[in-house]
Amino acid sequence: MSNKMWGGRFTDRPDAIMEEINVSIDVDRHLYAQDITASKAHAAMLAAQGIITANDAKNIGKGLDTILSEITAGKFTFKRALEDIHMNVESRLAELIGPAAGRLHTARSRNDQVATDFRLYVRDVLDETDAALAALQQALAERALEQADTVMPGFTHLQTAQPVTFGHHLMAYVEMVARDRGRFQDARKRLNESPLGAAALAGTSFPIDRHATAAKLGFDRPMANSLDAVSDRDFVLETLSAASICAVHLSRFAEEIVIWTSPLVGLIRLSDKFTTGSSIMPQKRNPDAAELVRAKTGRVIGALNGLLIVMKGLPLAYQKDMQEDKQGAMEGFAALSLAIRAITGMVRDLEPEPERMKLAAGEGYATATDLADWLVRTLKMPFREAHHVTGRIVGLAAKKGVALHELPLAEMQSVEKRITKDVLAVLSVESSVKSRTSYGGTAPKNVRSQAKAWLKRLAKDTKTR
């Protein structure tokens, strides 16, 4: 005879391989707090509905509190033979309070139980991620305000394109992270419905109050269809999707840090706190924190792809395949959390090299567009003609091996005789960034205004969170 808690139907014990492939406690033990919280809400509702006695509910609640304390203190023994977190908790509850523990599972299945637990877990992840991203935005906006006047090269195709400010570059990531936070917040809204009470798949004949348990657990409402309630994992997929986009943003920034800290580029410097050395080359300072962010963010994308593949062929309702929804997701969430904290630390730690940045900003004829704009504004030249004239002037400068502002005026006039010495005023990198005053442009005053606005907004968010 099977000794499993579900073993009444069975006359033989499971094969050892069956037990090995079926066990999930190594992963879902991380749901212990959510499992206990949901069970307490379920027990209270059962008592309120007269399905179990108030005394049984009281004893169940006390027993669950004891189990929570044991797990938190590291004194709880998780048993693989009991398969999962639900059976481990229920078994220990029976040891503590006796037969009343068996009443807890009335009008409930492990199908809706695990769906509830994992929703609560992912909701916690969403809230923690939002707070971590807000801290990253804070760090970025503070550094942007500090570096609003620091000129650096802006790039397209990884080639010097136009001068920008370091503050402007940092503010670009503030905006990216804002979209990330918006996606996580939207995912939370759709997640926040309770599957508890859907039972195995068809609901229950007991007069339960699903609205009461939903409210007790902080959900907006119970899910409207019991089949959907136990078989839905959209909330994990959507969270992992938002996490994957966020991971891409973090990885892009990490890549920039790797490039900028290279001695060949030298735009920024990381302290010893976020670099490591070499076991053979004494001089090395490697940006390993940034490189590891770049690598670990791939785990997030992998978790999304893995769960999509698990879910794509499953008919309604619950299938055992769905037991595989947690490990990859949890690892992905952990990788994202670490990456956010690492990037936040590096943002606070990094120091720009202003002179090198300024020099690099002027390389590659980065103020050529400023020359073309001057021709349009001053000489009323059509932009396409100004583009052509500027290209010829750049060609002359390149042939002579000089910067645009170093090219003699006579050489410029050989291409366009109406050019005057006034053009020199727009060819410095400082004048270039100051002129970019259009909304969203890199002008220092724009950067300061946007950084201050974001810091004010973030301070307000902190008060209301």
Swiss-Prot record:
Query: What's a BP term from Gene Ontology annotated to this protein?
Result: arginine biosynthetic process via ornithine
- Give the Enzyme Commission number: 4.3.2.1
Write the record's keywords in alphabetical order, separated by commas. Amino-acid biosynthesis, Arginine biosynthesis, Cytoplasm, Lyase
Catalysis: reaction(s): 2-(N(omega)-L-arginino)succinate = fumarate + L-arginine
Main subcellular localisation: cytoplasm
Q: What class of enzyme is it?
A: lyase
* Pathway where it operates: Amino-acid biosynthesis; L-arginine biosynthesis; L-arginine from L-ornithine and carbamoyl phosphate: step 3/3
Q: In the UniProt record, does the keyword Amino-acid biosynthesis occur?
A: yes
Q: Name one GO molecular function term.
A: argininosuccinate lyase activity
Query: What is stated as this protein's family in its record?
Result: Belongs to the lyase 1 family. Argininosuccinate lyase subfamily.
- Spell out the protein name for this chain: Argininosuccinate lyase
State the organism of origin.
Rhodopseudomonas palustris (strain TIE-1)
Q: Supply the gene name.
A: argH
